[in-house]
Design a protein with these regions (language model features):
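Pre-Walker A adenine-sensing motif
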Residues: 5-17
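Short glycine-rich substrate-engagement loop in P-loop NTPases that contacts/grips substrate
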Residues: 56-80
Length: 233
């Protein structure tokens, strides 16, 4: 999938670049967090060719041995270069057991400009102050907006863009499929993963079918007011 410029998020990242804060990029699965981090890494390298970017992507099998906080910390420290800007970027950080201990230690050393991404099923805003001892800046990423969808699909007609956006949605990973049924299947799979794996696992929900029905109720009634007993009714 090709990259597009997402200026809203790139501007947010640029404003905190180089700060001592831990930059945390959150968002639902497949909304474009990793691609955004990739684009921002390219921008940082372009602006400062001497910068040392230490990039760990836990989506890639080659980084599986680092999925424990001691190993992750050791890897980053081994790749540190004295005398230049050292930037740490860790994709899907929640896949590393005890990741917060590695991040807190790296942050305490005051040697790194730190960026991490993670699913907000595991990194909720309320969790950040508990997990990290240093100050965090959260940048929440959403699926493509109508403007981003239009730019990606190179659609100039507002009416056509809106009609297609309503039908196809903002999940960028679905755009590689030309067949509408394949796109729908992709989005359904993402939804199933969010509900039945991420949310259920995080909150230890035993009744998966009830959880699924509750989510379907909320999606079907997104414009209505409801109280907590409503989904049960």
């Amino acid at each position: 999938m090709r990259l597009i410029n997402r200026p809203f998020y790139m501007d947010k990242l640029s404003k905190v670049a180089g700060s001592p804060d831990i930059k945390v990029i959150t968002g639902i699965r497949r909304c474009g967090k990793s691609k955004l981090l990739e684009a921002f890494a390219s921008q940082l390298r372009s602006n400062d060719p001497s910068a040392n970017v230490i990039h760990v992507n836990f989506n890639l099998l080659e980084f599986e041995p680092l999925a424990e906080y001691h190993a992750l910390h050791t890897y980053v420290e081994k790749h540190y270069i004295e005398g230049c800007r050292n930037i740490v970027m860790i994709d899907e950080v929640q896949m590393c057991e005890g990741f917060e201990r590695a991040i807190n230690s790296l942050h305490a050393s005051e040697k790194y400009d730190i960026y991490i991404t993670g699913s907000n099923a595991f990194l909720l805003s309320s969790d950040l102050s508990t997990l990290f001892t240093g100050r965090t800046v959260e940048i929440e990423v959403f699926p493509f907006s109508l403007a981003e969808f239009s730019a990606y699909q190179e659609i100039t007609s507002p009416a056509e863009a809106l009609a297609r956006y309503v039908r196809e949605g903002g999940m960028p990973g679905s755009y590689i499929y030309q067949d509408e049924r394949m796109r729908f299947s992709y989005i359904s799979d993402v939804l199933e993963t969010l509900i039945l794996r991420d949310i259920r696992q995080k909150y230890r929900i035993r009744n998966a079918e009830q959880l699924k029905r509750s989510c379907e109720f909320l999606m079907d009634n997104v414009c209505l007011l409801y109280t907590s007993p409503s989904p049960r009714d």
